[in-house]
């Protein structure tokens, strides 16, 4: 039946797996909860199961898969296959994720790279970045990732961790980010922090229809905030305006630094 390939996106909320043929045609896809608070072996098992399900859904077996692409958030030692301290994964500290996944998948070759970089390169080769040689890519989800294509090549940096665009500081001494810095764009404009700011506002006594959601579910999601924006909620508008402003500042700063032909957005918030 021919060879097929697996691409895994390890996100802070979901693991997303795609199964492709050699011409990059998507044959099947699977999404499963990451359970980022769990230990590394649980996260690896979740990735492996989602991969096997994706291949089965496409009508193939794992014997037809010569290699697996794994995109993970940084910082990491990508050439060594080690996640050092991924911001939204509290248990992943100096974890040999490439070896662990390869062992679980019976020795499959694992190509390990920054999640935003591989998404950026995918858009450059086959998506919204086709036709340009210089582009900036943002992925908006639990966190904010980035990738930069310069003169047709992916910018990796001296330590493989270039283009951590979500951790560009846009408000000095601002909100505390999960990375430990204050004022990062991610601390304002990511899905998790959009929801967090709305929750904090409600807890401080601001009025909003979101209060019913918080009381019922015990939490608010980014989708909840945007759903209530559509319904005309004033707090939701305030929060999403702040998110949009943070993204605009981030884009302007990145534009001045890189002068891209195109800026591409992707991720769960899009």
Per-region residue spans from a language model:
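Structural signature of FAD isoalloxazine-binding scaffolds in flavoprotein oxidoreductases
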Residues: 161-164
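Short hydrophobic alpha-helix segments
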Residues: 30-32, 87, 158
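A charged helix-plus-loop insertion that forms the helical arch/lid used to bind
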Residues: 81-93
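Active-site nucleophile and cofactor-binding loops and adjacent substrate-binding regions
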Residues: 88-91, 111-117, 137-140
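Short beta-strand segments
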Residues: 9, 69-73, 113, 137-143, ...
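ATP-binding/phosphotransfer module of carbohydrate and carboxylate kinases, centering on a glycine-rich
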Residues: 1-67, 76-82, 99-109, 122-132, ...
């Amino acid at each position: 039946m021919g060879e097929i390939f697996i691409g895994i996106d390890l996100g802070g909320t979901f693991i997303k797996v795609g199964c492709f043929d050699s011409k990059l045609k998507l044959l099947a896809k699977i999404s499963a909860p990451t359970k980022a608070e769990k230990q590394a072996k649980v996260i690896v098992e979740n990735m492996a199961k989602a991969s096997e399900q994706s291949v089965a859904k496409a009508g193939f077996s794992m014997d037809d898969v010569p290699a697996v692409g794994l995109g993970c958030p940084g910082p990491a030692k990508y050439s060594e296959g080690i996640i050092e301290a991924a911001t939204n994964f509290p248990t992943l500290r100096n974890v040999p994720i490439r070896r662990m996944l390869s062992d679980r998948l019976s020795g499959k070759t694992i190509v390990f790279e920054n999640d935003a970089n591989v998404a950026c390169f995918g858009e450059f080769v086959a998506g919204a970045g086709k036709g340009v040689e210089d582009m900036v890519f943002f992925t908006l989800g639990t966190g904010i990732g980035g990738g930069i294509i310069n003169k047709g090549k992916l910018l990796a940096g001296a330590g493989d961790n270039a283009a951590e665009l979500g951790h560009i500081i846009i408000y000095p001494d601002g909100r505390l980010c999960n990375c430990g810095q204050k004022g990062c764009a991610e601390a304002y404009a990511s899905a998790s922090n959009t929801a967090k700011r709305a929750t904090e506002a409600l807890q401080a006594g601001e009025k909003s229809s979101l209060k019913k959601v918080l009381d019922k579910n015990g939490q608010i999601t980014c989708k909840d905030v945007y759903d209530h924006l559509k319904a005309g909620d004033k707090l939701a508008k305030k929060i999403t305006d702040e998110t949009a402003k943070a993204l605009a500042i981030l884009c302007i700063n990145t534009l001045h630094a890189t002068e891209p032909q195109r800026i591409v957005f992707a991720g769960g918030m899009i």
